[in-house]
Amino acid sequence: MAAVDDLQFEEFGDGATLLAANPDATTINIEDPSVSFGHQPRPPGSVGREEDEELLGNNDSDETELLAGQKRSSPFWTFEYYQTFFDVDTYQVFDRIKGSLLPVPGKNFVRLYIRSNPDLYGPFWICATLVFAIAISGNLSNFLIHLGEKTYHYVPEFQKVSIAATVIYAYAWLVPLALWGFLLWRNSKVMSMVSYSFLEIVCVYGYSLFIYIPTAVLWIIPQRVVRWVLVMIALGVSGSVLVMTFWPAVREDNRRVALATIVTIVLLHVLLSVGCLAYFFDAPEMDHLPAAITTPNQTVTAAKSS
């Protein structure tokens, strides 16, 4: 066992005395700014784990967390609160549009594309574009149906814009609001149900309407069969997005309640599609168009024979 004297602290002399005793010793000045000290050695495998966390987005800085906290803490009546829902880049919007056009079987649109970051930019402009696409295409369709009639005078129907806006925006906001309230009520009874926020549901409905923009443009074709084929394709694509998104939210509920919810979602979607086609494009004059053209010829033929 060591003696007590061996455990005493020993005071060293100054640097000059030590250098005089050992002139070949290497010296480093820690106050020299040109000297850099390496990092402490890390345990094996720690570098790989840090790189993995960086790729997964788990290694967030304190500044990012602070900014995120400030971003989420704005009151709902301020402009800054709603500004966060328009803070998306072009890649995110295009990726969500692609997801609504090419739904992946068995994949949830909210979990796959929205990822707890819903936006209102895409749904707002999709609905606005769809309103003008339906109104303008409906006017052009009516013009093409009566093209060539001498007694027909084209008058733009501007009221179609307001009607289309009322229908589209009411569907894109009121239906998600009712669905959100229903899911919230059922979630209080069945705790294992998947829950969505109101803005996530609005985001799903908004992006699911994108396919109707090219469909509305193609509805100008004055062929009823073509129009119904187009509406069935649009219904199949957009309806599958809604079903695959909301089925996980209700499948843990009572079987009848779950099926009734999905059927209601699909029926409202069908009602919107068929209603827009019937009101804005499928004009009653199409059925009487051949009679209106042949009637003058028959009158002229009868006059000549007499």
Curated annotation (Swiss-Prot):
The chain crosses the membrane at residues 120-140, 163-183, 201-221, 228-248, 257-277. Residues 30-63 are annotated as: Disordered. Keywords: Endosome, Glycoprotein, Golgi apparatus, Membrane, Transmembrane, Transmembrane helix. GO terms for molecular function: small GTPase binding. The keyword rRNA processing does not apply. Residues 141-162, 222-227, 278-306 are lumenal. It comes from the Eukaryota. Residues 50-63 have a biased composition (Acidic residues). GO terms for biological process: vesicle-mediated transport. GO terms for cellular component: Golgi medial cisterna; Golgi trans cisterna; late endosome membrane; nucleoplasm; plasma membrane; trans-Golgi network; transport vesicle. Residues 1-119, 184-200, 249-256 are cytoplasmic. It is found in: Golgi apparatus, cis-Golgi network membrane; Golgi apparatus, trans-Golgi network membrane; Late endosome membrane. The keyword Aminoacyl-tRNA synthetase does not apply. It is a multi-pass membrane protein. Glycans are attached at residue 297. Interacts with YIPF6; this interaction may stabilize YIPF1. May also form a ternary complex with YIPF2 and YIPF6. Belongs to the YIP1 family. This is Protein YIPF1. It comes from Mus musculus. The gene is Yipf1.
